[in-house]
């Protein structure tokens, strides 16, 4: 049994027990979060596809941690002058553990 959820403008295929890195949520570690934007659900009865979301199916997860990801370097080469620009960016993410998929 698995589901495809949407959060933070991205889609993730999850099943019970998975650990997933998603965009930052403003929720403390240890708290429960419920995702109701389920795009697809595959269970024992078959496949359900939402239009755009499936009503009655929710994914329960627990927030494990909130950290910064690895640094991404952005380099701007010089145009006509010898001015180099090198910048770094570290994106915040939230690590969650999927508890169960309810409904379906």
From Swiss-Prot:
- State if Plastid is listed as a keyword: no
Q: Which organism is it from?
A: Thermodesulfovibrio yellowstonii (strain ATCC 51303 / DSM 11347 / YP87)
One annotated GO molecular function is:
structural constituent of ribosome
GO cellular component terms listed in the entry, alphabetical order: cytoplasm; ribonucleoprotein complex; ribosome
Where does this protein have coiled-coil stretches? Answer: none
Q: What is this protein called?
A: Large ribosomal subunit protein bL21
Source taxonomy lineage?
Bacteria, Pseudomonadati, Nitrospirota, Thermodesulfovibrionia, Thermodesulfovibrionales
Q: Name its GO BP terms in alphabetical order.
A: translation
Describe the protein's quaternary organization and the partners it interacts with.
Answer: Part of the 50S ribosomal subunit. Contacts protein L20.
What Pfam families does the database record attribute to this sequence? Ribosomal_L21p (PF00829)
- Keywords, ordered alphabetically: Ribonucleoprotein, Ribosomal protein, RNA-binding, rRNA-binding
SUPFAM superfamilies per UniProt: L21p-like
Explain the purpose of this protein: This protein binds to 23S rRNA in the presence of protein L20.
Query: Which protein family is named in the record?
Result: Belongs to the bacterial ribosomal protein bL21 family.
Report disulfide bridges, numbered on this chain: none
The record ties this protein, via InterPro entries, to: bL21-like (IPR028909), bL21-like_sf (IPR036164), Ribosomal_bL21 (IPR001787)
């Amino acid at each position: 049994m698995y589901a495809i959820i949407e959060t933070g403008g991205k889609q993730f295929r999850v099943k019970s027990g998975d650990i997933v890195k998603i965009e930052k949520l403003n929720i403390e570690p240890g708290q429960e979060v419920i995702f109701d934007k389920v795009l697809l659900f595959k269970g024992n009865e078959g496949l359900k596809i939402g239009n755009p979301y499936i009503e009655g199916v929710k994914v329960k997860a627990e927030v494990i941690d909130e950290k910064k990801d690895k640094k991404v370097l952005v380099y701007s080469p010089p145009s006509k002058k010898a001015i180099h620009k090198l910048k770094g960016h570290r994106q915040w993410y939230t690590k969650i553990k999927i508890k169960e998929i309810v409904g379906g």
